[in-house]
Each structure stands twice: as structure tokens, then as C-alpha cells.
């Protein structure tokens, strides 16, 4: 099979193009919202509410949306969610015109945007398998991820520089990008698979089985919960507008660069891991990576130099990539095939929404103790979690090879 096999139809380029456009628009918009809301309210709590407004619908809708994506055409679900995101960009534009000094209308639109994400992410995950045969899936996933990583790196920087032209220009660009993304998604071809409907009780029983599986496997539970609490405590992304404006004095352009820095570290680390994968002492590497994430977060909080702050954010992204690589590998090896969908839904529900909940925690802590102490305390909290999890989950700490997580055959 040649390297170009997965590109022989228009569907894969259209699918990837749709994902790149929606990812870019989301990240550009997040930079604009963060700067605009903080500019209006001048309190870190306002930035925490930005995360909370998205977290509640995202957390509530992830599992139902995943089940819905199995019963209806995921292309329709994805296109509809992206149209909803485009509507949100239009509403942000309207709020900027009609209510330029009040954040409350923006919070309502953010909740709608979180609901749209709750539907778009499960649909995106399920759609690729509809578009390519099994033998082309691995290459399609690899190419999709590489281009999305480019979007994650470039999106915040583009958002910061776009915002120098004003929020109206930024939201207008996002609206157009979401509409184009929806058009590409709606035009996708591919294979349809009818999974059939099931009773509500049966769906929730399947979800409960996934939760029980995670709870009963120390390696899986430890890996998922370690990542969850590290992001909750150590994430500083929500407070970057405060640092850009009041600490480092670099404006919205600098904010975009700060937001891109973790993705740069993650991308470089992903390239390194692809060439030199972790083969031994996987558990030790996992805990060291999370500890490094916490330490770099503390150093970022204490920094007053823009370039040192960039380096520390790159380190957090690199450490997070190592953690994600090991966690995903351990969970995949530990989970038998019949349980993969349910375990994946559970981990996505808790880890996928933890960024927004972590944003709220950061905003609350900063409102109580100040921005810099909040970041330092969060990084220190991550180190405490690492020490506690080493004692609570010794099987995770002692994992050598990633394949050691494979359950024994009885």
C-alpha cells in the first residue's frame, strides 16, 4: 500500500480540512474570548467562568452524543455541530456590538459553544472509520493528527495577531472558518454503518460497565486520575491573558504566542517519541513527566521574563505529551477489545472536559490568592498528587514495559 492510498478520494482531504478549519477557528476564538472577557472584567474569576460555562454542557453531553453518533450518520451530527459553532461566532460578534462592556452575554454563548463541542468531538472520533477501509485507517489517522497538531501550534498565534485588528474581525474570520468546515463535513462520502438503536437503560448499563472496569484496574484508574488531577491543578492556560497583560506586558499578540508554546513543546516531543519510543520503566517515566509538568508550571508562575515563560510553557507541553503517550498506551494495552468503546467514553468524559474545569479552578484560585500564587500553588499541588499517586497506585509506578498492562488470560 502506497503512502498516497488514503488520499485517492476527496473524502479524506475534506475530512482533514474540516478538522483543521474548526480547530483553527476554535483556538483563534479562545484567544479572543480570553482577552476580551479579561479586558472587560479585569478579574481572573471571569476567566474561570469562561471554562466553567463550557465545561458543564461538554461534560453533560459527551456520553449521550457518543451514543447518538453510533445511531445516526455522524456526518450530519458533525456538520450540525459546526454550524452551531458558526452561530456562536456570529453571536460573539453580536455581543461585541451590542454589549461591549458586559461579559454575561458572552457566558451564555460560551455555554452554547460547549454544547456544540459536546456533539462535534464524539462525531469526529467516530467518523474517520466511515471514510476509509480498515487497511487505510492507520495512515489516515497519522496524517490527520499531524495536520491538527500544526493547527494547535498556529491557531493561538494567529488568534493573537488577528485580535490586534479587533474582536469583530477575529469573530468574523472564525464564523467563515466554521461555515467552511461544516460545508466540508456535510459533503463527505464514505461507508455508512447502522448500529441500530437500543433502550436507554441498556445504554446506561454499558456506560456503567465501562466505569466499573476503570475502577477495578489500578493501572487504568491511576493513569486516568493522575492526568485528571494534574490538569485540574497545574493548568495555567486560563490565566494566560492575565500574564500577557499585567505580568509580561506583551499584549494580545504575545498572548497568542504564549498559548502556542505548549503545543510547540508537545509537537517536538511527539516527533522524538515517534523515533525513540519509551520501552522500559514506563511507570517511572509517567510520574517523572507529570512531576516535571508541575515544576515547570511553578517556574512559569514565578517568571517575569517573556522568553523564560515561553520555555517553561514549552516544557509543560513536552511533559504533558510524554504523559499522554504513556497513559493512552497503558489504557489501550489494559483494555480488552469488547470494552474499548465504553472505556474510551469514560476516559474522554473525565479527561476531555478536565481542561475547562481546570480553567475554572485556576480562575477561582487566582481570585482568592492572586494570579501568581494560584499558578505556583497549582504546580505544587501537581507535585503533591504525584507523590500521593505513587503510594496509592503502586502497580502503575512499577510498570516496566507498556505491554505489561495487558491483562493476564485466565
Predicted regions and their residues:
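Intracellular juxtamembrane helix-capping segments at the cytosolic ends
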Residues: 33, 119-132, 322-335
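Structural signature of transmembrane alpha-helices in multi-pass secondary transporters
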Residues: 22-23, 54, 113, 144-151, ...
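Flexible cytoplasmic inter-helical loops of multi-pass small-molecule transporters
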Residues: 136, 186-212, 399-406
Amino acid at each position: 500500500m502506497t503512502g498516497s492510498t488514503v488520499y485517492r478520494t476527496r473524502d479524506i482531504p475534506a475530512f482533514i480540512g474540516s478538522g483543521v478549519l474548526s480547530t483553527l477557528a476554535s483556538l483563534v476564538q479562545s484567544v479572543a474570548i480570553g482577552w476580551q472577557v479579561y479586558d472587560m472584567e479585569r478579574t481572573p474569576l471571569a476567566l474561570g467562568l469562561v471554562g466553567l460555562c463550557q465545561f458543564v454542557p461538554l461534560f453533560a453531553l459527551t456520553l449521550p452524543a457518543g451514543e447518538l453518533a453510533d445511531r445516526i450518520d455522524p456526518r450530519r451530527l458533525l456538520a450540525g455541530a459546526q454550524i452551531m459553532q458558526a452561530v456562536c461566532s456570529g453571536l460573539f460578534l453580536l455581543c461585541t456590538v451590542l454589549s461591549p462592556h458586559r461579559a454575561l452575554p458572552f457566558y451564555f454563548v460560551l455555554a452554547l459553544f460547549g454544547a456544540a463541542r459536546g456533539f462535534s468531538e464524539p462525531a469526529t472520533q467516530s467518523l474517520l472509520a466511515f471514510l476509509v477501509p480498515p487497511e487505510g485507517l492507520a495512515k489516515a489517522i497519522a496524517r490527520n493528527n499531524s495536520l491538527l497538531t500544526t493547527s494547535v501550534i498556529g491557531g493561538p498565534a494567529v488568534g493573537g495577531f488577528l485580535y490586534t485588528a479587533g474582536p469583530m474581525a477575529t469573530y468574523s474570520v472564525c464564523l467563515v472558518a466554521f461555515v467552511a468546515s461544516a460545508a466540508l463535513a456535510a459533503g463527505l462520502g464514505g461507508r455508512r454503518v447502522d448500529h441500530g438503536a437500543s433502550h436507554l437503560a441498556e445504554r446506561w448499563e454499558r456506560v456503567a460497565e465501562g466505569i466499573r472496569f476503570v475502577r477495578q484496574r489500578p493501572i487504568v484508574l491511576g493513569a486516568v486520575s493522575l492526568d485528571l488531577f494534574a490538569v485540574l491543578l497545574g493548568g495555567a492556560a486560563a490565566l494566560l491573558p492575565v500574564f500577557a497583560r499585567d505580568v509580561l506586558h506583551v499584549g494580545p499578540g504575545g498572548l497568542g504566542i504564549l498559548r502556542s508554546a505548549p503545543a510547540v513543546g508537545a509537537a517536538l516531543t511527539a516527533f522524538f517519541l515517534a523515533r525513540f519510543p519509551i520501552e522500559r520503566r514506563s511507570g517511572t517515566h509517567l510520574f517523572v513527566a507529570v512531576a516535571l509538568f508541575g515544576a515547570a508550571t511553578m517556574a512559569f508562575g514565578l517568571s517575569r521574563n517573556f522568553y523564560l515563560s515561553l520555555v517553561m510553557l514549552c516544557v509543560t507541553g513536552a511533559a504533558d505529551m510524554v504523559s499522554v503517550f504513556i497513559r493512552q498506551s497503558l489504557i489501550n494495552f489494559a483494555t480488552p477489545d469488547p470494552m474499548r468503546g465504553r472505556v474510551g467514553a469514560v476516559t474522554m468524559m473525565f479527561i476531555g472536559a478536565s481542561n475547562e474545569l481546570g480553567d475554572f479552578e485556576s480562575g477561582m484560585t487566582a481570585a482568592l490568592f492572586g494570579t501568581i500564587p494560584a499558578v505556583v500553588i497549582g504546580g505544587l499541588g501537581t507535585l503533591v498528587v504525584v507523590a500521593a499517586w505513587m503510594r496509592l497506585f503502586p502497580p502503575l509506578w512499577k510498570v516496566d514495559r507498556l505491554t505489561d498492562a495487558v491483562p493476564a488470560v485466565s
